[in-house]
């Protein structure tokens, strides 16, 4: 293999640039040419492809977002779109592809794999919901962003003696809510993977209020429902003054943490190694701090599961 490509797809996550940097530098170190594909699969179909040199990835390891930009691409879900993408890869002489992104990005890599095109997936999403890895690129940074917000909101919640509902990202996975809620000392955490008992939450808030606790923090993953609606229900049920903060896309931005920079560098470099070894159709990850790789089709057949013991711990500590 002499020439590979790299793209980022779907929602961006802090650390993607560090992964791109690792792919480019690792490939050049081994004598390969690297081509950046801009705007994800949409850019692949459109032929937005440019050769990358070492200088192109200088001064990006600390930057959030992705220098290759990203986009959603419904067209790539069709056979026609996939064949257009493969045509562009062949036109540019690209023999293997590194795809950095989440579940949708992996689905695209899976399709290319099924067409016989060598791809390696690198998990880049703040949701931490990709099977086959303990952590995804961007999760740690997003987690720290949320914890910082919780700490600051708790200051004002204490001053005004209010209950605050904080809505965080996570349509299908509650890792951000769970980890941030546990680290931030939240009184209640609501995640998509677990049913919640409104009466229990209300009782917990009232018990705390009765023993002199004048403020509370509730973390709600967006997949559970609207934080605004939940805040109204809490205020009506408890009579406690309640405010709602929806953190939104601030969770996707910012300079990646050291953990995400190192993780992205390790995973990006390993993806290149797999292509050099002729092992396409794989996805990389980290488990017990060891690099691993899995068949991408088998990985997509699995379902991410939340840590139920951690969820139970969060409930026990919020009495």
Curated annotation (Swiss-Prot):
Protein name: ATP-dependent 6-phosphofructokinase
Residues the record lists as binding ADP: 21-25, 154, 185-187, 211, 213-215
Gene that encodes it: pfkA
Cellular component terms (Gene Ontology): 6-phosphofructokinase complex
Gene3D superfamilies the record matches: 3.40.50.450, Phosphofructokinase domain
Summary of the function given for this chain in its UniProt record: Catalyzes the phosphorylation of D-fructose 6-phosphate to fructose 1,6-bisphosphate by ATP, the first committing step of glycolysis.
Chain positions recorded as ATP binding sites: 11, 72-73, 102-105
Species: Anoxybacillus flavithermus (strain DSM 21510 / WK1)
Cofactor: Mg(2+)
Record comment: activity regulation: Allosterically activated by ADP and other diphosphonucleosides, and allosterically inhibited by phosphoenolpyruvate.
């Amino acid at each position: 293999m002499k020439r590979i490509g790299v793209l980022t797809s779907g929602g961006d996550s802090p650390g993607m640039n560090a992964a791109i940097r690792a792919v480019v530098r690792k490939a050049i170190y081994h004598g390969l040419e690297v081509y950046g594909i801009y705007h994800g699969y949409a850019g692949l179909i459109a032929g937005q492809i440019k050769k990358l040199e070492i200088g192109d990835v200088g001064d990006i390891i600390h930057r959030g977002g992705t220098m290759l930009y990203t986009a959603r691409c419904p067209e790539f879900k069709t056979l026609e779109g996939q064949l257009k993408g493969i045509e562009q890869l062949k036109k540019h002489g690209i023999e293997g592809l590194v795809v950095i992104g989440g579940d949708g990005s992996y689905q695209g890599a899976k399709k290319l794999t099924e067409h016989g095109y060598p791809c390696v997936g690198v998990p880049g999403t703040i949701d931490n919901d990709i099977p086959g890895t303990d952590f995804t690129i961007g999760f740690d940074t997003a987690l720290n962003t949320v914890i910082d917000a919780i700490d600051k909101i708790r200051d004002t919640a204490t001053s005004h003696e209010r209950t605050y509902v904080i809505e965080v990202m996570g349509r299908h996975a509650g890792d951000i809510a769970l980890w941030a809620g546990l680290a931030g000392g939240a009184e209640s955490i609501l995640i998509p993977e677990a049913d919640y008992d409104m009466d229990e939450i209300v009782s917990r808030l009232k018990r705390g209020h009765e023993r002199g606790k004048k403020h509370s923090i509730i973390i709600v993953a967006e997949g559970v429902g609207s934080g605004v609606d939940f805040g109204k229900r809490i205020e009506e049920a408890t009579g406690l003054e309640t405010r709602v903060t929806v953190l939104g896309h601030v969770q996707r931005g910012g300079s990646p943490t050291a953990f995400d920079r190192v993780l992205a560098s390790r995973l990006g470099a390993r993806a290149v190694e797999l292509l050099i070894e002729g092992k396409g159709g794989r996805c990389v990850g980290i488990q017990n701090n060891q690099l691993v790789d899995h068949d991408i089709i088998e990985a997509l057949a699995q379902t991410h599961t939340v840590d139920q013991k951690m969820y139970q711990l969060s409930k026990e500590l919020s009495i």
